[in-house]
Amino acid sequence: MPLSSRGFSAQLWALVGATFLGFLGIGTVLPMLAPHIRYDLKGTDQDVGLVIGIFSFVALAGRLISGPLADRRGRKISFLTGLGCCGLAGAIYLLPIGMAGPYLARIFQGMGEAFLYTGAASWVVEIAGVQRSGQALGYLSSGIWGGISAGPVLGQWVGTFARAAALQMLLAAVAFLVLTQVKEVYHPVPHHGPRTWLPPGILGPGIAIGFVNVQYPVIAGFLILHLKAHGNSGPAAFSAYAGTILLSRFFLGGLPDRIAPAITFFGGLSCMAVGLLLLASGPSPTLAIIAGGILGFGFSFPWTAVVSTVIRRTHSSKRGSSVGVLTAFYDLFVGVSSFTAGAVAHQWGYGAAFVMAALALVAAAIAGRYVFFGQAEVELPRVAATLPGR
C-alpha cells in the first residue's frame, strides 16, 4: 500500500487504530483492579501493590524479547503476539482461580504491552519512512494516550470488573482481526555474528529516556495528593497534562522531522522543568492547571526526538531491538523512581518529589548532549533507500 506525498496511508492508520484498541482494553481494567483484589478476592494492600508492580518487571523482560523477534520474524508477528497476550489477560481475569488470576493476568498484560508497542513502533516507521519517523511515532503515541485516557472512563461505565475484563478481551480480539488484514512487506536482513542485548550506541539514548520519565510516577502517584491542600485541583491538572500530551503528539509529533531533534528535546526538557517546579510550589488551582499543561507539552517531545534520532542511525534489521531496549529503559527508570519518589515524599513532603523529577531532567540533558552531538547519522542514506514510500 503506497504512501502518497500528501499524507500517510490507510495501512498506518490501521496500525494506530489497532494500538488504540489494545491500550483502550488495558486501560479499561485498571480502575477496577484494586477494588477487585481487595473486596472480591479478599486480598491485602500488599497484594494490590505486587499485582500492579509485576507488570513493569514483566514488561521490562518483554522488551528484550520482542525486539529481536520483530527483527527476525517481522513487526506484525510481534504486534499480533502482544494483542494475543492482552486478550489472554482479559480471559484469565475471569477464571475462578482466586488471587492467582490477577497475578497471572498481569504477567500476560505486561508481556502483551511490550510486544504490542515494539511491533507497532517498528512497523509505523517502516511504513512512514525514516524521514517522517517522528510524525509516525507521534500518531502512534496519540493512539496509546487516547486508549489509556479513555480506558478508565469506559471501565467505570461498564460498572463491574468482570465486564471490564470481558471488554478488554473483546477489544484485543477486534484489534487482532484488524491487524490480520494489514499486509506487511518486511524481509529480514541476515545477521552475521553474535547478537547483543544492547545495540551499539543505545546506552546514552536509553539513559536520556529514563531520566525524562522519572516525572511520570511522580505525577501518577502524587499530583492529586499534593494539590489536595491547594484547592483540590489535582484531577483538573492531570487532565490538562494528559490532554496536552495527546494533542501535542498528534498535531506536533512531526517537529523532530522538520527541525533539529535536539531543539525539540531540550525545548521539551525546559518546559517540563518549568511545569514541575510550578507544581512543586503548591500553586493556586488556575496556575496548577497551566503548569500541568506546560509539563504535558514539554513531555510530548523528548521521546520522539530521541527515538527518531536512534532510528535514523540504525539499520532496519536492528530497529525492533533498538525500540525494545529504549522502552526497557523507560520501564526500569519508572519502576526505580516509583520507589524513590515514595521515599522522598515520605521524608520531605510531596513537593520534594516534584523537585526530584525536575533535577532528573538535568541528568537527561547531560545524556542528551551525547545523543544529539556525539554521533553522526552514518546509516541513514543506506537505510532510507530500502524503505517503502521513499
Positions of PLM-derived features:
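Residue-level signature of mid-helix packing/kink "hotspots" within the transmembrane helices
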Residues: 56-64, 148-149, 242-250, 334-335
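Conserved MFS/SLC helix-loop-helix module at the cytosolic interface between two early adjacent transmembrane helices
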Residues: 61-97, 256
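Helix-to-loop junctions at the C-terminal end of transmembrane segments
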Residues: 62-74, 159, 248-261, 345
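Structural signature of the two symmetry-related core transmembrane helices
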Residues: 77-91, 263-278
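Cytoplasmic helix-loop-helix junction between adjacent transmembrane helices
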Residues: 105-143, 308-309
